[in-house]
């Protein structure tokens, strides 16, 4: 006959002694349990004893005892209906004996007559520090004295947290108030405190109102001790608290700070204390400041106690683990627990797996991640194919999380399946369906189109409206629990780049095959990373550069009125929907904010000056947007300017105006760089060559050639002793270009799209932006500038270039490791290159630390014109000639190195294949190389469809 009893646990708090009563299934008589627990060592005891020694100078003498009654078990196995997470109230009571050791608590069983009075229902007391159990309150007091405690014990009910100093009063309360309630509980709720005289109990109730419930399934009696230790492990891992006013507080001492990196640094002081290792916030999926268990006030003690309520018996299973679902009863009204558990990083939702045999009890494991464990180098492509669209119609790029990467709490939710999207209420019993049910949660949404290997997901307008009406939309600008640092954003975007790098080849092939059939307008928006060009691959690849328009929207797509490419049958609604490819809009917002923080070159005056000049040339450029109230002004906000189209926010009016270029509708065949409008695709191609071509200035006195006029002048002055005036006069002609017409300024183009040009006062370099010319001007002022080959940024300090590369982190082909290696090599060898001749300038295939062709000043017209391709050798070409796919790489590495001036160093981005590691400085070479992996990409897609079908079955 199974005998049931209740257990009281004493839990220490900062400067206090407290106790909590929890219910526990006891299979043997109480006295036998007493002897077993006295002799059986508990691993939690050693941890708590170490804690007691650490905080012996910070404790008080007040003990708090929380009691609860539980009926006798009537069956061996029952389904688990509900359990409640109970926590200790936070209070600090000064005591004259505050220098004694921390209170350690005892367990006590009531006398047999208590069982008879309560109809076979027993109440027992348990010490949370040493697990001592007894049925006599006097034995409990004697046990507390053994811990050096002489002060009185306060009793507290574990269900409603009523406190009392009288044992009889609390016993009567448990029998009268909770006898009937224990039989009808189906869902745990925080109980309102009813004791008006105890501020301690009131504070407990206020805190428990924000604590989510934890349904737990316990294997057997032997695993209960391990289960308690696992919950305590959860508390020990929560070694810090996040206050509501935005400060982090160390629970081992009184240290407070405003940033997690400062908290991490501080944690070294507590290394080795109570299993406190160096903190990694990777596993922190709970909302900061909301799940504030008893460890929020008790340093390293038993901070969470699982309580079984009423007739809910502890189920006995043979499974290897205990599934724990943490959810909020308030959240159930808008979304189901399954949906919450699948949404990592969303407030008040968490899915964890507790293994009684493990020390690490709170490792987050999701089925989606388990199914995507990398076994090969094709993980990135699998991540992209497995991604599902979010509710705003953007593609969420799933990236692989690094061990030290940190997640933001403002991450957008994934769309669940149709049943989960309805947001209907599910009881906690229904929520615990196991991993079989969880598989359906992570299934990708059906609205995913495979466009020749380029995976584009979207949400229909009806689905978006439904989600909006259901209130499932999350505010993208809601302040997260912690801001992602620049380095974390860089790592995140680099991982996204690896996932995206396998896709461009299939999209490029289809576009080359299909776009030729479309001669109408609005085929592809000029702001996108893909542009409609009915000509050769070289010019097309130039326009495929994903970061060509960083200020014009990075990689976002605007609405298109015609079909992007031929869609599978039954999926033609893509032509009318808002299509987004590349990275999601949430990542776009992060990147734009990142660019603001890292753009150390452009001040507010520069941006406003540029925008003012552009407005004078195009007075109607932003009036349509502003007239439609696209920009929302929120007074008294940190970022008052907000874009209504994508929720991008900024604290600078110039930045928000610059951001509006993302949504600007362009004319067909309009140049995305200088607003020039061509008549047809051929004219646009010829015009684009003007922006991309390499200018070579050749000395008339010898056969030397240079990429900059300043280098030519220095050469003529030093080698041929020519004055500067003669050098300037003779350097007007040596430019070798595809044709003379392409050398004209843009003002001579379409008069309706005339935009002011900024010209360098030293050479004839021109740019549509003031910042671009200013950056270019530094080339003439520095002996050894370091140049970014993507946007033309130059600096004399290599670490500055390393920091600058953050703004390019969203490039599809951005290889973070290789770029870092190249820059580091440039730093380490910056002192040696001076002694080398131009022909011996270092140029390694894996480092690419010197590439003047890619890094020429004319290769990037401004900071927003990101041309990463190696320019072609255009000597002697005419206007009607078209570039071949290999013409952009006509320069051999040896010839490039021979053209490198001795005083210049360049850091070149590599285009990397994430499948086999192939690297090239030319995007065309990478696209050609990716054809070899076409079969592998198709296999990935087929395997994904096969796995999805298996999961569905």
Swiss-Prot record:
It comes from the Eukaryota. It is found in: Nucleus. SMART domains: ZnF_C2H2. The keyword Nucleus applies. The modification Phosphoserine is found at residues 95, 427. One of its GO terms (biological process) is positive regulation of transcription by RNA polymerase II. Belongs to the krueppel C2H2-type zinc-finger protein family. This is Zinc finger protein 507. The lineage of its organism: Eukaryota, Metazoa, Chordata, Craniata, Vertebrata. The gene is ZNF507.
């Amino acid at each position: 006959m199974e005998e049931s009893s209740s257990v009281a646990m004493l839990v220490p708090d900062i400067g206090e002694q407290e106790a909590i009563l929890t219910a526990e299934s006891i299979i043997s008589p109480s006295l036998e349990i007493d002897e077993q627990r006295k002799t059986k060592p508990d691993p939690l005891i050693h941890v708590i004893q170490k804690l007691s020694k650490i905080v012996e100078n910070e404790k008080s003498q007040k003990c708090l005892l929380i009691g609860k009654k539980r009926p006798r078990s009537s069956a061996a196995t029952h389904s688990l209906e509900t359990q409640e997470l109970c926590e200790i109230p936070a209070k600090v009571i000064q005591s004259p004996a505050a220098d004694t050791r921390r209170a350690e608590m005892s367990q006590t069983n009531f006398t047999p007559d208590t069982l008879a009075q309560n109809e076979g229902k027993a109440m027992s007391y348990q010490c949370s520090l040493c697990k001592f159990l007894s049925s006599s309150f006097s034995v409990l007091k004697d046990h507390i004295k053994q811990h050096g405690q002489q002060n009185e014990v306060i009793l507290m009910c574990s269900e409603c947290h009523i406190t009392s100093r009288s044992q009889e009063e609390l016993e009567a309360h448990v029998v009268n108030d909770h006898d009937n309630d224990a039989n009808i509980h189906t869902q745990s709720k925080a109980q309102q405190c009813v004791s008006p005289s105890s501020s301690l109990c009131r504070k407990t109730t206020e805190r428990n109102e924000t604590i989510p419930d934890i349904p737990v399934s316990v294997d057997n009696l032997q695993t209960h001790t391990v289960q308690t230790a696992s919950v305590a492990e959860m508390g020990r891992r929560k070694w810090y608290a996040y206050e509501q006013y935005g400060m982090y507080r160390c629970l081992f001492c009184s240290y407070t700070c405003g940033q997690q990196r400062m908290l991490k640094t501080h944690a070294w002081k507590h290394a080795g204390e109570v299993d406190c290792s160096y903190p990694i916030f990777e596993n922190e999926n709970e909302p900061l400041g909301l799940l504030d268990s008893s460890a929020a006030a008790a340093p390293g003690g038993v901070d969470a106690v699982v309580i079984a309520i009423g007739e809910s018996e502890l189920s006995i299973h043979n499974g290897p683990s205990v599934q724990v679902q943490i959810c909020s009863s308030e959240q159930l009204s808008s979304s189901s627990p399954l949906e919450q558990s699948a949404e990592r990083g969303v407030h008040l939702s968490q899915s964890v797996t507790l293994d009684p045999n493990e020390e690490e009890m709170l490792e987050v494991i999701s089925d989606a991640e388990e199914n995507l464990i990398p076994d090969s180098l094709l993980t990135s492509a699998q991540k992209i194919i497995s991604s599902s669209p979010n509710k705003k119609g953007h593609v969420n790029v799933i990236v692989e999380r690094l061990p030290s990467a940190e997640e933001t709490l403002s991450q957008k939710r994934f769309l669940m399946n149709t049943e989960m999207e309805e947001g209907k209420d599910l009881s906690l019993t229904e929520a615990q369906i196991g991993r079989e049910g969880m598989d359906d949660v992570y299934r990708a949404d059906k609205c995913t189109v495979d466009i020749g290997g380029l995976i584009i997901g979207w949400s229909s307008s009806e689905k978006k409206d439904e989600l909006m009406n259901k209130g499932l939309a999350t505010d993208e600008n809601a302040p997260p629990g912690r801001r992602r640092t620049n380095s974390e954003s860089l790592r995140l975007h680099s991982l996204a780049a690896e996932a995206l790098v396998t896709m461009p080849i299939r999209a490029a092939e289809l576009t080359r095959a299909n776009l030729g059939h479309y001669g109408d307008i609005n085929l592809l928006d000029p702001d996108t990373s893909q542009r409609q060009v009915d000509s050769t691959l070289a010019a097309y690849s130039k326009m495929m550069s994903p970061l060509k328009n960083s200020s014009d929207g990075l990689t976002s797509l605007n609405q298109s009125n015609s079909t992007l490419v031929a869609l599978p049958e039954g999926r033609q609604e893509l032509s009318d929907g808002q299509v987004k490819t590349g990275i999601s809009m949430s990542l776009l917002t992060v990147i734009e904010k990142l660019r603001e923080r890292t753009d150390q070159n452009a001040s507010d005056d520069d941006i406003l000056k540029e925008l003012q000049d552009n407005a004078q040339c195009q007075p109607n450029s932003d009036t349509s947007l502003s007239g439609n109230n696209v920009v929302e002004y929120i007074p008294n906000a940190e970022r008052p300017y907000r874009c209504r189209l994508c929720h991008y926010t900024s604290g600078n009016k110039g930045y928000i105006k610059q951001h509006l270029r993302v949504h600007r509708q362009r004319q067909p065949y309009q140049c995305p760089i200088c607003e020039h409008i061509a008549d047809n695709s051929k004219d646009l191609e010829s015009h684009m060559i003007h922006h991309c071509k390499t200018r070579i200035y050749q000395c008339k006195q010898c056969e030397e050639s240079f990429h900059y006029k300043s280098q030519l002048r220095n050469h003529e002055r030093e080698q041929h002793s020519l004055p500067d005036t003669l050098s300037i006069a003779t350097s007007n002609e040596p430019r070798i270009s595809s044709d003379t017409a392409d050398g004209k300024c843009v003002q001579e183009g379409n008069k309706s799209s005339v935009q002011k040009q900024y010209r360098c006062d030293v050479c004839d370099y021109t740019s549509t932006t003031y910042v671009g010319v200013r950056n270019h001007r530094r080339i003439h002022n520095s002996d050894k500038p370091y140049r970014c080959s993507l946007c033309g940024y130059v600096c004399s300090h290599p670490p500055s270039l390393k920091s600058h590369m953050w703004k390019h982190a969203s490039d599809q082909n951005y290889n973070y490791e290789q770029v870092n290696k190249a820059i580091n090599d440039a730093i380490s060898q910056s002192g040696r290159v001076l002694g080398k001749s131009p022909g011996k300038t270092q140029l390694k295939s894996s480092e690419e630390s010197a590439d003047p062709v890619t890094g020429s000043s004319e290769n990037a017209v401004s900071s927003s014109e990101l041309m990463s391709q190696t320019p072609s050798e255009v000597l002697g070409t005419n206007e009607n000639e078209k570039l071949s796919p290999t013409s952009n790489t006509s320069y051999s590495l040896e010839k490039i190195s021979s053209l490198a001036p001795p005083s210049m160093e360049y850091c070149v981005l590599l285009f990397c294949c994430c499948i086999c590691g192939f690297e090239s400085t030319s995007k065309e070479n990478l696209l050609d190389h990716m054809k070899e992996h076409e079969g592998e990409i198709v296999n990935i897609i087929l395997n994904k469809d096969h796995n999805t079908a298996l999961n569905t079955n």
